[in-house]
């Protein structure tokens, strides 16, 4: 009985320590302090290494800190680490939306540092992961956004990359700006406070030659306050697209 009580109290202590570490990490993440957040999340991982939700949080820190790193090597290393945590989360919780979304996000952030072949191969997995995330949680606005970005990207790739994509896919999967628009509109309906949905919808309309709609959504997104770490970079893309329309 005494041994049982000791084990019970020890277990309670571990859970309390874990919860406190995660809470502290969340507070740092809310301030965009990703390295500081990892100082709490990584010790929490040692207490509960099979907690998929925590692994998604860790993945997100490594993915977002890529923006703050000065060189390609550092960005790529951080992105790869983010991807490894996301893949672990998927293995532990294959029926949850967020781990699949994390894989899609990590691959999306890594694609600028890939060669054409690796980029096209990553694109295939992005689509699979984003579609899985949407299927598991149709109310996951960012999953719809990632699926929209996939359609937007593949619908507008250049000739050489398109030819390579055809070789890897065998036959290119259906992708269109129209489907991208549908995905971004769903994302906006689910979360109208995320400016990236508006900016990417506007950019897609611009790619379609629908300038009035492009300007309306780009200006709407650019007028919104920054709430997320990627928002300044998103606005840079939006301003560049708006300038091309002027």
Predicted segments, located by residue:
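N-terminal leader/linker segments that initiate helical-solenoid repeat arrays
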Residues: 14-67
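Short coil/linker segments at helix-helix boundaries
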Residues: 28-36, 60-95, 102-139, 149-186, ...
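C-terminal/domain-terminus segments
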Residues: 195-233
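Sec-dependent N-terminal signal peptides
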Residues: 3-12
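Short helix-capping/linker turns of helical repeat alpha-solenoids
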Residues: 48-50, 95, 139, 193
């Amino acid at each position: 009985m005494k041994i049982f009580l000791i084990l019970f109290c020890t277990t309670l202590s571990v859970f309390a320590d874990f919860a406190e570490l995660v809470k502290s990490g969340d507070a740092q993440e809310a301030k965009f302090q990703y390295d500081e957040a990892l100082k709490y999340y990584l010790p929490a991982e040692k207490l509960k290494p099979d907690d998929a939700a925590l692994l998604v949080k860790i993945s997100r820190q490594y993915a977002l800190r890529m923006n703050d790193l000065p060189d390609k090597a550092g960005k790529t290393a951080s992105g790869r680490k983010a991807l490894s945590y996301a893949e672990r989360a998927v293995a532990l919780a294959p029926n949850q939306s967020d781990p699949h979304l994390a894989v899609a996000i990590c691959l999306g952030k890594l694609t600028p540092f890939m060669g054409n072949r690796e980029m096209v191969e990553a694109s295939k997995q992005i689509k699979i992961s984003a579609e899985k995330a949407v299927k598991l949680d149709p109310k996951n606005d960012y999953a719809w956004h990632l699926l929209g970005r996939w359609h937007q990207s593949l619908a507008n790739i250049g000739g050489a990359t398109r030819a390579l994509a055809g070789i890897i896919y065998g036959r290119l999967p259906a992708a269109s700006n129209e489907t991208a628009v549908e995905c971004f509109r769903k994302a906006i309906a689910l979360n109208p406070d995320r400016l990236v949905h508006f900016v990417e919808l506007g950019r897609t309309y611009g790619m379609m030659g629908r300038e009035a709609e492009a300007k309306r959504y780009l200006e709407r997104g650019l007028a919104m306050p920054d709430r997320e770490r990627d928002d300044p970079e998103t606005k840079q893309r939006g301003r560049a697209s708006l300038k091309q329309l002027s």
